Amino acid sequence: MKDYKGWKFKGKELSYIRDVLSTDFKAKSSGTMNERLEIKFAKMHNQRYAVTANSGTSTLHMALNAFGVGHGDEVIIPGLTVAMCGYAVWQCGAVPVYADVKKDTFLIDPEDIKKKITKKTKAIMVVHLYGLMCDMTEVMKIAKK
């Protein structure tokens, strides 16, 4: 087994780390370095804005809030997923509705999504697992109805 020789920084990484650690960072998603990342990322993707987050759970909250999911709404999520998907839905005041997954992929089953839709359905949350993608063509057809 090879001995661990420490981090191998090639550019300005150490300087950037020192800058962050020497500021009033306080573990929040703000600060000069964060703002620089958001601006550069937005430009790379030809967008006006980009928003960083500290976790996937935070991004789920942002997405649900951006789509106006709230009290009394239902969000269809896969029956096999991380708990945070359901937690994010609950925190918005909505109700997670679990759709079955396909036996061959363990991904959300578009046929079961159709069965779960009610007048209260506000969103469908897909989760891509194990290097596999959900059938987004079929899910989007359902979502657009």
Q: Where are these predicted regions, by residue range?
A:
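Charged, low-complexity surface patches
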Residues: 30, 78, 132
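Short, flexible helix/strand-to-coil boundary loops that buttress conserved ligand/catalytic motifs
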Residues: 21, 73, 117-118
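Active-site phosphate-binding strand-loop segment of PLP-dependent enzymes
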Residues: 104-145
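Conserved PLP-binding active-site segment in aminotransferase class I/II-type PLP enzymes
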Residues: 1-66, 70, 91-92, 126, ...
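Generic non-transmembrane alpha-helix signal with a bias for helix starts/N-cap capping motifs
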Residues: 34-35, 82, 136
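Alpha-helical elements of the RecA-like P-loop NTPase motor core of helicases
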Residues: 15, 61, 86-87, 134-137
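Substrate-binding/gating loop at the entrance of the active-site cleft, primarily
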Residues: 45-47, 53-67, 71, 76-111, ...
